[in-house]
Amino acid sequence: MSMEEAEECSAACGFSLTCQEDGADLGDGVVDDDDDGDVFLFYNAVAAADDEEEEEEYVEQMVSKEASFCCSSSSSLFDAAAGDGYGDGDGDGDWFRQARLAAVKWILETRGYFGFGHRTAYLAIAYFDRFCLRRRVDREAMPWAARLLSIACVSVAAKMEEYQSPALSEFDAGGGRVFCSDSIRRMELLVLSTLGWRMGAVTPFDFLPCFSSRLHRHHHGGAGAAGHGAAAAARVALNAVGFIFATAEAGSVLDYRPSTVAAAAILAASYGAPLTKEALESKMSNLSPSCLIDKENVHACYSMMVGDMNNNRRSSKRPLQCSDSNEITTTSTYDSVLVDDVTDTAAFAATAMNKRLRPEPPRIR
């Protein structure tokens, strides 16, 4: 991919991609039955606790929605990349994995820097993976092209999710790299066009509140979602976040459906010690009684999460700490940045106050 491919978009670089709306047209959150299904569904844990049928309907709708964004299980980003020449040169093809890992780490660090929500970071990683599945990035252009792509993906995700997104000049590319706002905006447009302007993908965070609440309720004999039960479910969901981002670092987020990742993360965060396949399938019935989630894929994803956790425990002399004395047992870039408090994390809503430090990058070309 070269910058020339984006030149056709240069005429549009004088405008902002941020939608100028104040939310007045959203009403009281009531969704018109005539909507085409592109609106996001929101999970109300307290209401759903009293109506498991409604809860299951929510999961069913989210699973159906995620299907349109998922990659075929037989097609991996890394397999496709290798087949498109990403593995040429040194014989092992690790350079693309390393470039992607650096991009994901930068995205997670940027999430912590600006105080973005978890969903924003995950969407940015998903945009990056989807883009690389459709377009080839030349090795000679790495790592600057991957960093420019990372900035564009985070910027678009922030415009999708945050109440206020940073100005393009606020993003610190790191490593002495400097990108002008026009270059970032052109890359944003290239990302949008490459992904067909379909940016509202489902993420594991759309399932976490529901899954953690259901698992806690069944585990404690039908305890309600209020009070101590809600706090306990929120703690499990918070710990699951670390597993989700550790998995995102380890491989493409397109390899597993968001519902699969969410289920595996909740189970890993809830039980820690490896469960047998039979025990895992038994626990899964509490998450989705109608078997909407593929058990084989959940088991594979869960095994990877727990395996990485055990490997990290053996290689680390002390656990990593995060805010509010909560420990994330996986070792990933996510662990080194501050997480939101438990209440905000359980809600998985963008924080109303975007706590933003303002970097001062050098003058850009």
From Swiss-Prot:
Sorted UniProt keywords: Cell cycle, Cell division, Cyclin
Gene Ontology molecular function terms on file: cyclin-dependent protein serine/threonine kinase regulator activity
Species of origin: Oryza sativa subsp. japonica (Rice)
Stored Gene3D superfamilies: Cyclin-like
Keyword Lipid metabolism (UniProt): no
GO cellular component: cyclin-dependent protein kinase holoenzyme complex; cytoplasm; nucleus
Protein family according to the UniProt entry: Belongs to the cyclin family. Cyclin D subfamily.
PROSITE patterns: CYCLINS
BP-aspect Gene Ontology terms: cell division; G1/S transition of mitotic cell cycle
Transmembrane helix listed as a keyword: no
The name this protein goes by in its record: Cyclin-D5-2
Pfam family, one: Cyclin_N
Entries under InterPro entries matching the protein: Cyclin, Cyclin-like_dom, Cyclin-like_sf, Cyclin_C-dom, Cyclin_N, Cyclins_cyclin-box
